[in-house]
């Protein structure tokens, strides 16, 4: 029992859990359990009362609802690190920012270069721009003491800025037709959150209440509802009136739910791809190649080149006692897009099967390639 508890508390466990539920989803979708698996996640669930109801399939409740809590955690983490943590120093924060920029621009350009003549495929240009924090850090932790703390912090910081970039991309490019009334309600909710923050209110139930209303309003507005999580994170106070840490405590309470429940459930709901009738040629289709080359090559090259240029221009500094060889290994791991890439894929193609799920398979291939190559590279290079 003690051994199970120790394993569950280790930093590698979230990554292992994601891998397990990914393979479980693939097993379910490609076996006699396929119909049960599909029907379960497509089953409609209605929440509300007589005159106000929200009805969605289970997979959409996960993708639109639970993932908002994940984005809330990302927002809280970033806010804490910038105001109190490792990113307080501008020199420390500049390297992961440049890396995140390179890791978004380069994969997007590679995807666009391959798919520019296919209008529908081009909707997925942002798919290879994401990094999965839990998976990437989980792989890194498997290497133990071989990786210096400064490099672990760089990867975590870069992944946070990467996810922030993904949030901006979702807001700007994957927003449906807007509803003026719903947006007005969103603004009222934001004003309410501002008041709660201004008066240093630390009753979490009030933030939850306003947050739920904000999430519903955003759902109806046309702006993706998961952004509600980011907005809420901006207004949660750092400390209580007595100067006791508050934001960090909220993050500590939420984090286990995200890494042990929400992300594994998201992986299980979205990684189920039927590959039984898939032709090998579909993996070499333009959309698949764009995703694989963008994630596996574009991410590592983009992150490294942008960081290298920033260092040479003295805009950023390589962590102390770190050589470029080891640093490049971290850049390879940024190609693990997995859950974030699957999420953007769902927004871009609305879960269409026009590509026969070759797009999702490409995400898995690129993510596992980045994980395996990055792990072996970091194991070998000193």
Curated annotation (Swiss-Prot):
Which gene carries the instructions for this protein? nhaA2
Ordered alphabetically, the record's keywords are: Antiport, Cell inner membrane, Cell membrane, Ion transport, Membrane, Sodium, Sodium transport, Transmembrane, Transmembrane helix, Transport
A GO BP term here is: regulation of pH
Q: Which Gene3D superfamilies match?
A: Na+/H+ antiporter like domain
**Name of protein:** Na(+)/H(+) antiporter NhaA 2
Q: Name one GO molecular function term.
A: sodium:proton antiporter activity
Report the locations given in the UniProt record: Cell inner membrane
Q: What is its main location?
A: membrane
Transmembrane parts of this sequence: 7-27, 58-78, 94-114, 124-144, 153-173, 178-198, 199-219, 255-275, 291-311, 327-347, 361-381
**Pfam families for this protein:** Na_H_antiport_1
The protein's role, per its UniProt record: Na(+)/H(+) antiporter that extrudes sodium in exchange for external protons.
């Amino acid at each position: 029992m003690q051994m199970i508890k120790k394993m569950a508390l280790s930093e590698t466990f979230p990554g292992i859990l994601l891998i397990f539920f990914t393979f479980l989803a693939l097993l379910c979708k490609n076996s006699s359990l396929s119909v049960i698996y599909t029907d379960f996640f497509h089953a409609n669930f209605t929440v509300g009362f007589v005159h106000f109801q929200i009805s969605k399939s289970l997979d959409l409740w996960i993708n639109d609802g639970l993932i908002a809590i994940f984005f809330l955690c990302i927002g809280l983490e970033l806010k804490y690190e910038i105001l109190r943590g490792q990113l307080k120093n501008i020199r420390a924060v500049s390297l992961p920012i440049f890396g995140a920029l390179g890791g978004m621009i380069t994969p997007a350009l590679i995807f666009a270069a391959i798919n520019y003549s296919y209008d529908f495929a081009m909707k997925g240009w942002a798919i290879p721009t994401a990094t999965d924090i839990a998976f990437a850090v989980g792989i890194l932790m498997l290497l133990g003491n071989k990786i210096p703390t400064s490099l672990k912090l760089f990867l975590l910081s870069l992944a946070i800025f990467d996810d922030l970039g993904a949030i901006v991309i979702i807001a700007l490019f994957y927003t449906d037709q807007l509803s003026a009334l719903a947006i007005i309600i969103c603004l009222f909710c934001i004003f309410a959150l501002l008041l709660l923050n201004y008066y240093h209110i630390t009753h979490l139930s009030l933030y939850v209440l306003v947050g739920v209303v904000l999430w519903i309003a955003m759902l109806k507005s046309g702006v993706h509802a998961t952004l509600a999580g980011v907005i809420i994170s901006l207004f949660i106070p750092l400390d209580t009136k007595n100067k006791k840490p508050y934001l960090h405590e909220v993050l500590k309470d939420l984090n286990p739910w995200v890494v042990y429940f929400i992300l594994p459930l998201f992986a299980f709901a979205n990684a189920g791809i039927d590959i039984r009738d898939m032709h090998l040629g579909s993996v070499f289709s333009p959309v698949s190649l764009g995703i694989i080359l963008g994630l596996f090559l574009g991410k590592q090259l983009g992150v490294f080149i942008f960081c290298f240029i920033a260092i040479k221009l003295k805009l950023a500094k390589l962590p102390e006692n770190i050589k470029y060889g080891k640093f490049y290994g971290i850049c390879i791991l940024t190609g693990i897009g997995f859950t974030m890439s699957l999420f953007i894929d769902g927004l871009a193609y609305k879960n269409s099967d026009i590509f026969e799920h070759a797009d999702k398979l490409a995400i898995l291939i690129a993510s596992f390639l980045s994980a395996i190559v990055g792990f072996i590279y970091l194991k070998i290079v000193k």
